[in-house]
Amino acid sequence: MLGIVLSMAASTENWKTQIRKGYLELCILLLIKRQGKVYGFDLLERLSAVSLEVKEGTVYPLLNRMNADGLLSATWETENLKGHPRKFYSLTKDGSRFLGEMSQEFEQMVSAFKKLGKE
């Protein structure tokens, strides 16, 4: 019995990890669109403010991948900043299109889930 419970817990954690990956990417793109440009630590704070606790080791590789995929552009800025230069990310045209498609798909999935719950 304990083995089944542990297996279910592992399956649940795996499912949550997979869901969060796609959802986190959607949230990051949405935040960047709303802000215009954002640097990594600011992004972490904004995610935390809406109860999405994410580690730096998760966000920075994701930002780098989305930058490499052409969804984001990155620029180093030092003007008007106290301290070290910061790498700011902004949405590209491809990123904006991708966000629109992802948002629509996400809304359809949530709608279908809600409909299933009402049956």
PLM-predicted stretches and their roles:
Residues K16-T58:
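N-terminal helix-turn-helix DNA-binding core of bacterial DNA-binding proteins
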Residues N14-Q18, W76-T78:
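Short beta-strand/turn micro-motifs at beta-sheet edges
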Residues R20, N64, N80-L81:
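Short secondary-structure boundary/capping segments
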Residues L91-G95:
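Accessory beta->alpha helical hairpin/"wing" motif in late/C-terminal subdomains of nucleic-acid enzymes
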Residues D69-G83, S90:
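Beta-hairpin "wing" of winged helix-turn-helix
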Residues M1-W15:
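Short, intrinsically disordered or compositionally biased N-terminal tails of bacterial proteins
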Residues V59-P61, R65-M66:
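Basic amphipathic alpha-helical segments that dock to polyanions
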Residues S96-E119:
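Amphipathic alpha-helical dimerization/coiled-coil segments
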